[in-house]
Swiss-Prot record:
It is a peripheral membrane protein. SUPFAM superfamilies: C-terminal domain of alpha and beta subunits of F1 ATP synthase, N-terminal domain of alpha and beta subunits of F1 ATP synthase, P-loop containing nucleoside triphosphate hydrolases. It catalyses: ATP + H2O + 4 H(+)(in) = ADP + phosphate + 5 H(+)(out). The gene is atpB. Its EC number is 7.1.2.2. This is ATP synthase subunit beta, chloroplastic. It is found in: Plastid, Chloroplast thylakoid membrane. GO terms for molecular function: ATP binding; ATP hydrolysis activity; proton-transporting ATP synthase activity, rotational mechanism.
């Protein structure tokens, strides 16, 4: 891994010889900067504007060079508000791209796009920084072995398994359990894989970012008493930030994740919420730079921008970055260029269902809508594949019978269909699971269920061996042995009541 050798802390590197320019034009978040002949900065170099505005307030704005215009001018996009900037102000070329702090000291902290901490906990205790612009790993470095990334969550591991070093799309509206699922994954990768997580909040609401931080502290994912024991680093570039910040915050989070993968040789989970906002910010910047828009008004470089981010998210021989990306679908139109370009990179989709959440089935992952390219016999094995297919078939048949049940009732079904419905209801409940991070809310201890245990449990339900057990025994338990123990307890309780 190429680590920028600067020891100047986050944001930008320093040069002994300053290359100075001056602001020639300001159009919103875009600056044109004039430099002396022969002293033009490179594309993606960080420029810093320091000075005072008309009322004497200190200004410190970092920009990134996007275009070389000719006539010794460059066009740069600001990473923070340009309020108070004036023509003629001095601009320093740092001679390097934006660099952000990396390493264990970033865990438990919140950063902005420049790698500056924004959580009022003081400076970050690291002198190692890394530039946010890097090429993707070379073919020779990639790990080509297809392997499943075990999450310990039954419904995910059985029906839509994640690929180690893969990319997963997370679809779900408000209030169906996206945040809790994300926090459980962060918790499980730390405990089962010794891995860490990086969360990139790209263009979402500031309130949601604050809520996530508070919930992480409450559930122990971020350890307030000993910040070094935390399992996640947070990088936020929210809705109120300029488009330059929203466009680059995903790269800041990815750079932190790459260090854990390449130097610490760990498995890393990278969350991006929301990948659509990354595209949206790129579209705004593209228009500000005067590029001709493409389909539906998106930037002509949409595929290139998405590819440059997604291709860096991969498994190497050192470690892996597995990415879970929340995908907003504008107007529910899956053919929109933004989600359509995202789908090309995804290995699996996890769809959260409001109907399941309303029934109290958590995690509310839809077993029929969620998909994975990993669910093939040659990758997961015949036993896993057959069990998953039978679970899906049983769930699909139950879904088809629901209208008949609603109109005529269960008694009008054939004996075979009644058996299918009974097993499907047990499966539906057994797909629920108590989470470690939800212990503080539910009072039930969390459960991590290995893949072999998950397959065994569903095979027993499908075989009919557990037909005599009540369906409530399968609700919010870990493995199948807990379900049988719960059934015995329910039987004892009912006998005592009599």
């Amino acid at each position: 891994m190429r680590i920028n050798p600067t020891t100047s802390g986050p944001g930008v590197s320093t040069l002994e010889e300053k290359n100075l320019g001056s602001i020639a034009q300001i159009i919103g978040p875009v600056l044109d900067v004039a430099f002396p002949p022969g002293k033009m900065p490179n594309i993606y170099n960080a420029l810093v504007v320091k000075g005072r505005d008309t009322v004497g307030q200190q200004i410190n704005v970092t920009c990134e060079v996007q275009q070389l215009l000719g006539n010794n001018r460059v066009r740069a996009v600001a990473m923070s508000a340009t309020d108070g900037l004036m023509r003629g102000m001095e601009v320093i070329d740092t001679g390097a791209p934006l660099s952000v702090p990396v390493g264990g000291a970033t865990l438990g902290r919140i950063f902005n796009v420049l790698g500056e901490p924004v959580d009022n906990l003081g400076p970050v205790d690291t002198r190692t920084t890394s530039p946010i612009h890097r090429s993707a790993p070379a073919f020779i470095q990639l790990d080509t072995k297809l392997s499943i990334f075990e999450t310990g969550i039954k419904v995910v591991d059985l029906l839509a398994p994640y690929r180690r070093g893969g990319k997963i799309g997370l679809f779900g509206g408000a209030g169906v359990g996206k945040t809790v699922l994300i926090m459980e994954l962060i918790n499980n990768i730390a405990k089962a894989h010794g891995g860490v997580s990086v969360f990139g909040g790209v263009g979402e609401r500031t309130r949601e970012g604050n809520d996530l931080y508070m919930e992480m502290k409450e559930s122990g994912v971020i350890n307030e008493q000993n910040i070094a024991e935390s399992k996640v680093a947070l990088v936020y570039g929210q809705m109120n930030e300029p488009p330059g910040a929203r466009m680059r915050v995903g790269l800041t989070a990815l750079t932190m994740a790459e260090y854990f993968r390449d130097v610490n040789e760990q498995d890393v989970l990278l969350f991006i919420d929301n990948i659509f906002r990354f595209v949206q910010a790129g579209s705004e910047v593209s228009a500000l730079l005067g590029r001709m828009p493409s389909a539906v008004g998106y930037q002509p470089t949409l595929s290139t921008e998405m590819g440059s981010l997604q291709e860096r998210i991969t498994s190497t021989k050192e470690g892996s970055i597995t990415s879970i990306q929340a995908v907003y679908v504008p107007a529910d139109d899956l053919t929109d260029p933004a989600p359509a370009t995202t789908f090309a990179h995804l290995d699996a989709t996890t769809v959260l269902s409001r109907g399941l959440a309303a029934k109290g089935i958590y995690p509310a992952v839809d077993p029929l809508d969620s998909t994975s390219t990993m669910l093939q016999p040659r990758i997961v094995g015949e036993e896993h594949y057959e069990t998953a297919q039978r679970v899906k078939q049983t769930s699909q048949r139950y879904k088809e019978l629901q209208d008949i049940i609603a109109i005529l009732g269960l008694d009008e079904l054939s004996e075979e269909d009644r058996l299918t419905v009974a097993r499907a209801r047990k499966i539906e409940r057994f797909l629920s699971q108590p989470f470690f991070v939800a212990e503080v809310f539910t009072g039930s201890p969390g459960k991590y269920v290995g893949l072999a245990e998950t397959i065994r449990g569903f095979q027993l339900i499908l075989s009919g061996e557990l037909d005599g057990l009540p369906e409530q025994a399968f609700y919010l338990v870990g493995n199948i042995d807990e379900a049988t123990a719960k059934a015995m307890n329910l039987e004892v309780e009912s006998x005592l009541k009599k």
